[in-house]
C-alpha cells in the first residue's frame, strides 16, 4: 500500500457546484485506486449520502483522472446520473 496526496476540482459553470479541495493522504494499492476513493469522497461531499461515482477515467498526464459524480435518478430510459465532472490529481507522498 502507498499513500497518495490529491487535489480535486469540479469542472462546472454553475457557481453552486463549484468546488476545489485537497484530501488528506489516502492509502491505496495504486494511483487509480486512490483516485476512485477520492472520487467517492467528493461525491459524498457534494451530494451527501446519495452521492455516487458514475465513471473514472485516466487522462493523458500520469496521476490525472476525470470522474463523473452525482445522484442517480430515474429517467424514461432507466437510470441517469445527474451531477458534475471532476478533475483529480494524485501523487505519492514519498
Regions found by a protein language model. Give the residues of each.
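Short aromatic-glycine-(Arg/Gly/Cys) micro-motifs in beta-strand/loop hairpins
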Residues: 1-22
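Hydrophobic beta-strand residues in large extracellular and virion-surface proteins
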Residues: 4-6, 26, 34-35, 39, ...
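Beta-strand elements of well-folded, non-transmembrane domains
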Residues: 10-14, 27-30, 71
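A short, exposed loop/beta-hairpin motif centered on an aromatic-Gly-Thr core
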Residues: 17-33
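A short, charged, amphipathic alpha-helix used as a generic interaction element across diverse proteins
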Residues: 29-51
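Short, mixed-charge low-complexity intrinsically disordered segments
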Residues: 44-94
